[in-house]
């Protein structure tokens, strides 16, 4: 059984409190988890269900802390087996990948193709409709069996898949679970193989349920879109989001939080609006300085991966001017 590194959360949120409760009898619970996995007696606990609205409305089903530890243990064991078969340019929830790496790769491809093809560059921006909630259990289990032959591991995986909270029987995996992230990548790899090995699309990148295909051939992209829609429906029992579209790359491609152009990259207008709103809230006294700094640094970190020099400087100057006004008025500014 691989060693599980149980790291302390870096904040005082509910997760941190659950960590401390767990750590009070950590050794005993880890031994129990190992035994349950080994003896196939692990039974998943009940979900806590809530919604989040950033970046869009999603239903989250969170497991008890103990179950998260057990499933982390399971993923540590089976994850590397799956990883060997994943498409290289699938970037979600994988070590060494992530949103910024996906964004950088798309930018690189767009620049390369602009040099090769001039202005004749198009992109198919695809999105799988309600991906996590629509994955069929029977087909997901089939995909798992293409990678894993161990019957004990498959038994545990099947049990986790079947216990899907308030979703309909036989369909859907909960957003938020570590195992769900892995299973979603496993199932998405079926699409990756089709696009790469059947359609032979060279410039194809995916981040979970969002994907981009670049080409200088507009008619080819239209044909690929049609075949992908058919493949998703017939082979994967999924639907493409009606908002999926083919667009001229020179107008920008929205992917992983950025608007990508062949020669530069911008942040989404919504991100800029949120930052400016936070600044106005600070100036109006509606947002505490400490809370503002958390949001501000987070958004600056995001903007730092795009061409936003003039934007960030403008906001810095506005904040400096506000601080100067506060000082002139004799109002103390919290550190």
Residues of each region from the PLM?
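Conserved two-metal-ion catalytic palm core of "right-hand" nucleic acid polymerases
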Residues: 1-140, 165, 335
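Conserved polymerase palm-domain catalytic core
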Residues: 29-32, 36-37, 89, 104-208, ...
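A generic structural signal for residues located within well-ordered alpha-helices
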Residues: 65-69, 179, 183, 251
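Short, glycine-/Ser/Thr-/acidic-enriched flexible segments
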Residues: 67, 218-219, 260-261
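Right-hand nucleic-acid polymerase module
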Residues: 72, 163, 168-169, 222-223, ...
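A generic secondary-structure signal for well-formed alpha-helical elements
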Residues: 77, 81-85, 144-152, 164, ...
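Surface-exposed helix-capping loop/turn segments at secondary-structure junctions
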Residues: 84, 197-203, 236-240
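Helical (often loop-to-helix) elements that flank the catalytic cores of nucleotide-handling enzymes
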Residues: 218-239, 268
């Amino acid at each position: 059984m691989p060693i599980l590194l149980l790291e302390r959360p870096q904040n005082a949120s509910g997760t941190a409190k659950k960590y401390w409760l767990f750590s009070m009898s950590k050794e005993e619970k880890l031994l129990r988890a190992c035994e349950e996995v080994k003896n196939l007696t692990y039974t998943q606990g009940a979900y806590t269900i809530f919604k989040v609205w950033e970046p869009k409305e999603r239903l989250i089903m969170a497991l008890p802390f103990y179950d998260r530890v057990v499933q982390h243990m399971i993923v540590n064991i089976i994850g590397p087996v799956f990883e060997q078969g994943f498409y290289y340019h699938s970037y979600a929830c994988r070590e060494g990948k992530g949103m910024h790496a996906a964004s950088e790769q798309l930018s690189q491809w767009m620049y390369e193709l602009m040099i090769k093809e001039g202005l004749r560059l198009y992109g198919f921006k695809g999105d799988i409709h309600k991906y996590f909630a629509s994955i069929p259990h029977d087909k997901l289990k089939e995909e798992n069996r293409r990678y894993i032959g161990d019957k004990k591991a498959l038994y545990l995986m099947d049990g986790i898949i079947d216990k899907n909270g308030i979703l309909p029987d036989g369909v859907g995996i909960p957003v938020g679970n570590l195992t769900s992230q892995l299973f979603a990548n496993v199932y998405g790899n079926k699409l990756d193989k089709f696009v790469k090995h059947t359609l032979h699309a060279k410039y194809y990148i995916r981040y979970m349920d969002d994907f981009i295909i670049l080409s200088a051939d507009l008619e080819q992209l239209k044909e690929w879109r049609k075949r992908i829609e058919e493949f998703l429906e017939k082979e994967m029992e999924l639907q493409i989001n009606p908002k999926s579209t083919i667009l001229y790359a020179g107008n920008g491609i929205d992917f992983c939080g950025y608007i990508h152009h062949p020669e530069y990259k911008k942040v989404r207008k919504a991100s800029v609006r949120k930052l400016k709103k936070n600044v106005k809230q600070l100036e109006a006294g509606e947002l505490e300085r400490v809370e503002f700094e958390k949001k501000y640094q987070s958004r600056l970190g995001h903007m730092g991966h795009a061409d936003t020099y003039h934007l960030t400087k403008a906001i810095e100057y506005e904040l400096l001017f506000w601080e100067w006004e506060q000082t002139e008025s004799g109002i103390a500014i919290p550190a």
